[in-house]
Amino acid sequence: RVLFRSFVCNLKGGGSKTVSTASLSHAFRAHPQLLFEDLRILAIDFDPQASLTMFLSHENSVGLVENTAAQAMLQNVSREELLSDFIVPSIIPGVDVIPASIDDAFLAEGWKGLCEEHLPGKNIHAVLKENIIDKLQHDYDFIFLDSGPHLDAFLKNCIGAADLMLTPLPPATVDFHSSLKFVASLPALIDSIEMDGHTCNLIGNVGFMSKILNKSDHKICHSQAKEVFGADMLDMVLPRLDGFERCGETFDTVISANPATYDGSTEALKSAKSAAEDFAKAVFDRIEFIRTNGGM
């Protein structure tokens, strides 16, 4: 199986990027129908808030964390160092994470100068792909990327490294509008990366509804999103359920949460887990379809 890289991206804060990425990472490994695939999953966190790290390996999101994904890029460490010093296991075996830290924000801010100093001759948008992902292509089957809601060097590196983008579309009016504005600006953003000398290998951008309820205005948003994305819109959604919010409070995903210690209705947890698994299977099937057909 050839490594496939997905980037869940939206410039709207609170748009379910991290919840989606964490749920996909765990569900790709633990979904009953995907167990036999024995998929090796790596999540890479570039959000200085380290929310993805909290979900997947919360002990690595506390205090001073020096071995972050941003540092791995900048230090251009070897594959062996990546595996031994930077990659940490999540609570589900077979799913690993490279953490983020609040200090990474300063690296993103001065990225161009840092690259000129530490990585002379390297394209500033190709660092993630060349210094991390290319070294791990035989160690993982899927890599999920998560960045903060900022148009910074890390987001551009994620776009420059991804095979596929996934855009969560929350239906709240302001969130939905800003999400569609981001989608409209993507071609120009990709052009700017390529004009700087790095070729993007994006096959496409798949949209999906997040935080959705069974309400008429949410259904209208879903219809409008289908008009924008066409066949690139997933029918499967990531609904707004109590289980997702409660699990976030205990640094779990709905996949990894223990029903015995879950602070809430076990039925609610079961519903959220089922929704996350259904969503992950739909994403997996779409990726396999794209691979088989050589594009969208």
Which residues does each predicted region cover?
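P-loop NTP-binding core
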Residues: R1-M296
